[in-house]
Amino acid sequence: MRTIISLLLLSAMVFAVIEAISLEEGLQLFEGERGCVGENQQCADWAGPHCCSGYYCTCRYFPKCICRKDSGK
């Protein structure tokens, strides 16, 4: 009986650790996107603000750099 209870507690602890790690990774991804700007917004790749996922920073007329939609090339 003690063995079964010990295994259940061990399983619960392993599950809690795995869940905490995946939650932390998700929060880090969200924090990385928080300060981003969208299409046709002013950006600066070297210092920020950075473009959101799916966009890239292009500087045709420095210092007027803007985010453009990434075509996936």
Swiss-Prot record:
Predominant location: secreted
A GO CC annotation given for this chain: extracellular region
Any GO MF annotation of the entry: sodium channel regulator activity
InterPro entries: Beta/delta-agatoxin_fam
Disulfide cysteine pairs (residue numbers): C36-C52, C43-C57, C51-C67, C59-C65
Extent of the signal sequence: 1-20
The keyword Repressor appears for this protein: no
Alphabetized Pfam families for the sequence: Toxin_7
Record's function text: Insecticidal neurotoxin that modulates the insect Nav channel (DmNaV1/tipE (para/tipE)) in a unique manner, with both the activation and inactivation processes being affected. The voltage dependence of activation is shifted toward more hyperpolarized potentials (analogous to site 4 toxins) and a non-inactivating persistent sodium current is induced (site 3-like action). Interestingly, both effects take place in a voltage-dependent manner, producing a bell-shaped curve between -80 and 0 mV.
Family: Belongs to the neurotoxin 07 (Beta/delta-agtx) family. 03 (aga-4) subfamily. Aga sub-subfamily.
Protein's name in the database: U3-agatoxin-Ao1c
Organism field: Agelena orientalis (Funnel-web spider)
